A protein has these predicted regions:
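ABC-family P-loop ATPase nucleotide-binding domains
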Residues: 1-7
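Charged, flexible cofactor/metal-binding loops and thiol motifs
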Residues: 4, 94-165
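Conserved ABC ATPase signature
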Residues: 10-14, 18
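ABC ATPase nucleotide-binding domain signature region
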Residues: 19-22, 49
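A short, proline-enriched helix->beta-strand linker immediately N-terminal to the Walker B motif
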Residues: 29-33, 62
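Catalytic Walker B motif of ABC-type/P-loop ATPase nucleotide-binding domains
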Residues: 35-38
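P-loop NTP-binding/switch modules centered on Walker-like glycine-rich loops
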Residues: 43-118
Length: 165
């Protein structure tokens, strides 16, 4: 598609790649210093993801970028990572530290999950209850995890919130 033909289309009529390009063009008009992108590479193949990040870096070389993703390969392209479960922070640090030596059982489970082995269903997250949102599926959970407050831990490179260390 050339730009003139894109103007006459509704968003649902654009391919995933073209929709991403239009979104980037709109953001480029704002000269943003902070970009927040929710699943920006969803539906793109590896080549499309690489093109997306190259384009993002060329248009916004000095902007801070917050990428929200479930794709570990996308998270691996970032400088830092924050792992959330049920809206709660479980682990944060540099990508190399968190992906290389995860501390929280949830992060370990995410990294161990392989699409080739089949994805497990998402856990039912308990709302309005204290304790770890990963309790029901955690191999290391105990009674303290069910109702206790998650404590912040650090090893100097990674921070994680867990009921046990």
């Amino acid at each position: 598609d050339v730009p003139e033909t894109v103007l006459d289309k509704y968003p649902f009529q654009l391919s995933g790649g073209m929709a991403q390009r239009v979104t980037i063009a709109l953001a480029a008009c704002s000269r943003a210093r902070l970009l927040i992108a929710d699943e920006p590479t969803n539906g793109l193949d590896e080549a499309g993801r690489a093109q997306f990040f190259a384009l993002l870096d060329s248009i916004f070389p000095d902007a801070a970028k917050l990428i929200i993703t479930h794709d570990i390969s996308v998270a691996a392209r970032c400088d830092r990572v924050l792992v959330l479960c049920g809206g709660r922070m479980l682990e944060t640090g540099t990508v190399d530290a968190v992906l290389g030596t995860p501390h929280h059982p949830y992060t370990k489970a995410l990294l161990a999950a392989q699409v080739a082995n089949g994805m497990q269903p998402s856990p039912v997250l308990r709302e309005g209850v204290s304790g770890c949102p990963f309790y029901a599926r955690c191999s290391e959970s105990d009674e303290a995890c069910l109702n206790g407050a998650m404590q912040k831990h650090t090893d100097g490179k990674i921070e994680w919130w867990c009921c046990h260390a």
